[in-house]
């Protein structure tokens, strides 16, 4: 079980793990590391910790150093240059008539590479675009096609709830979300009601799903005949949050509500 440090390269981004290399770091320290993209600067989110080997990609790389003022200045300068590179790329994309939507642009710390993230409905032949960009920017060019959920994460925004998007605020990874989760929570299945800014099912459908599944497994099915303190009847509705059910009793016009524990005492 290796000792590692969790480093994040963007807000709410996925953690990448590095060995400390005998360097003492604290949470929120800026560090210089070698990533799969090149030399980058990131922020420490998890200090020294033990982690199972199956949860990391081996072999682990070392932290190079704690970022100094020169590194921070270079990082900030790179961000300004990335804004200009993004404008340039958008102009070239427009001139070339490419059907792609540029999302953002990032330089590695040593400027050995510039990465453009984009979305597109189909595969794009961007070989000519790469050639033109390389002539202008004098560095290696990487064009990376991402999905709409990643686009929302990078750009940020406001969700239907009126709060900042979860994916751009605190969600490191996207977990699978299904329409069944909305059904289990008795939510409207209208796509406009359960879709996020990205157009996909809202990530928050997952948050309470485990609770709903746990409680639902304890409650009887709708239509099931059960025995209550007031006689026999059929379940006509369930209230997951209240852990209760409405039961239509024989000889009663209106259903009565019972807590789960009231029914359990009958058995």
List the predicted regions and their residue ranges.
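A short, compositionally biased
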Residues: 1-3, 25-27, 219-222, 239-243
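Acidic-enriched and Gly/Ser
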Residues: 1-191, 267
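A short macromolecule-binding patch
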Residues: 16-17, 252-264
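Short coil-to-beta-strand transition motifs
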Residues: 35-40, 224-232
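Short, conserved beta-turn/loop elements at beta-strand boundaries and strand-helix junctions
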Residues: 48-52, 238-243
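Conserved glycine-centered short motifs in functionally critical loops
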Residues: 161-228, 236
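Secretory/periplasmic and organellar redox-cofactor proteins
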Residues: 237-239, 262-267
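Basic/aromatic-rich interaction segments and small domains that mediate binding to polyanionic partners
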Residues: 239-257
